[in-house]
Amino acid sequence: MQMKMKTVVVAAMAACGMGAALAQSTPSKVELWGVVDAAVRHTTNEGADKGGLTKLIGGGMSQSRFGINVEEDLGGGSKAIAHLEHRFNADTGMKDDTAPFFQLAYVGLQGPYGRLTMGRQWNVLFDVVASTYASFPYSPYMDAYKPELGMAAGARTNNALKYTLATPDRKWVGTLQYSFGEKNNTSSVQQYAVGALNASTNPQVAAVRTALGGQYTAGAPIKNIPRLGNAVQQVINGVVQTSADSLSDPTGLKAKVEEVGMGAMKTFGGFLRYSANGLSLGAGAMRTTLPGGSDLDAYTFGGSYRSGLWYFNAGYGLNKYKPTKYANRVDSYINYLTDRQILNKMWSGQTNGGFSGGYFENAADKRQMIKLGVGYQATKQLNIGAHFFRAKQSGSSDGTYNGNANFMVLAADYAFSKRTDVYAALDHTKVSGGAGLVIDPQSKAKTRTGITVGLRHRF
C-alpha cells in the first residue's frame, strides 16, 4: 500500500496565489512510497579462514528504498509520468557507495500510443523475468540471494529509451530498449595503469621501462622485449585483478574501474510477453557494448503458471561475451581487461551470479542458467517457496573457469498485514569444475550456506 500525497507541488503554488486554475485543469498526483527491510544473515566459508559470518544486512527479501511517482493527466487518454527511486542500507542508513543516488530516474509519456520513458531504468532482461517468471509469487527475487540477476547484464541501464506497447486486454506486451554510451570509455583506467607501470619497482618492469625510453605510455608495446614483456602484462593483470577482487588498491584504479562500470553503455534489446488464464510466457534479448569495445549478448525465455494456491515458474538465460581484440599495446590491453572486470562483476558474488568468470586471456566467455521454482500459499498469511538454479560456464581456454554451479533456496514469508511481513530463508551454493571457479576470491570457497531472517515494511 502506498501513501498518496495529493498534488503537493500544486498546493504550494496555490498558496502563493499561483496555479489554482492549472491545478483544476490538469489533475495530477504525487505518491511517496517506500520499503524498509532489515535482516540477520549468517553465512559459512567466509574469509581466508573459511569461518562463519553473522551480520545485520540492510535488505534480505527486498532492498530498502523510497521513491516518488508522479502522474499528470494530459487529456485524451494521455498522461505524463515520472519516477525517482533511491536505495539505501537500512542497517546503516547509508547508500551503496558503488551505486548512484537514484537507482531509477526516468520521465515519460503514456497513452493509447503506448509508453515512452527516458532515463535510468530497469533493462528489458530484468523486465521480462520479473513480470513473467519471477522466482517468488510475493517478491520477484530475494535481495540477499539472487543468482538470477547475474544473467541480467547489470539489470539497470543509464541513458535508456524504452518504448512499450500492449494490446487493450494486456495479454500481449512488448518493449524495445536503446541506450546511449555517451563518452564512457577507459581513458581514466589507462591513465592509472600507466602510472602503476611507471611507479613499479619490479626489476623486469623497470627494465622494459628503460628500453622504452624511461617511461610507459598508453601506446607503449607490452611484449616488445623477449622474456620481459610478459612481466609488464602481469603487472597490469595484478593491478586490474586487485581492483576486481576488492583487495588493497593503492593506485586508485579500483575507483576508476568502478566508475567506468557504472557509466552509460550502449544497449539495444527488447522483450515480448503473453499472459492469460494464469499462464505467462516471455522472451527477451539485449546486446550491451562495454566501454572497451567488447559486446555482451544476453537472452532469456521462460514462463509461469498460477493455479489456485500454487505458483510454478521456469526459465533459461544465456550470456555470450565477445571480447574486444587487443593489439600489442598497453591501452588496448587495458580495454580488454576493463571489460572483463565489468563482466565479472555482473557474474560474481554469492548474491549475484555466484562465481568468477575470470579476468584474463583464459577467462570464460559463456554462461547459461536454468531456473525452476514453486510457491504455495499455505494460509492467507503464509507463503512458502523453493527455487533451484543450475549454471554452466564455458569458453575458458585452459579450463580454469569452466564448470557448473548449483544454487538452492527455501523461503517462507508471513504477512502480519498488507504492509508488514516477516520472512526466513535457507540457501546453499556449490560450484565445481576448474580451479578458478570459486564463490569469492578471499575465501576461495566452493560451497556456502546462508540463513536469513528479516522484517519488511512497505508504505
Label the model's feature ranges.
Residues G229, P250, E258-F407:
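Detector for outer-membrane/organellar transmembrane beta-barrel domains
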Residues V36-V40, L84-H86, R120, L176-F180, ...:
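Transmembrane beta-barrel strands of outer-membrane/channel proteins
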Residues Y414-F416, A445-F459:
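Outer-membrane beta-barrel "beta-signal"
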Residues S25-H42, L53-K183, R273-N277:
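Outer membrane beta-barrel
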Residues T54-S64, P100-Q103, P112, A155-N159, ...:
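Residues that define the transmembrane beta-barrel architecture of outer-membrane proteins
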Residues S78-A80, Y113-L116, D169-L176, G278-A283, ...:
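Repeated loop/turn-to-beta-strand initiation elements of outer-membrane beta-barrel proteins
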Residues M1-Q24:
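Gram-negative bacterial Sec-dependent N-terminal signal peptides
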Residues G67-N69, Y106-G108, K162-T164, F271-R273, ...:
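Outer-membrane beta-barrel architecture
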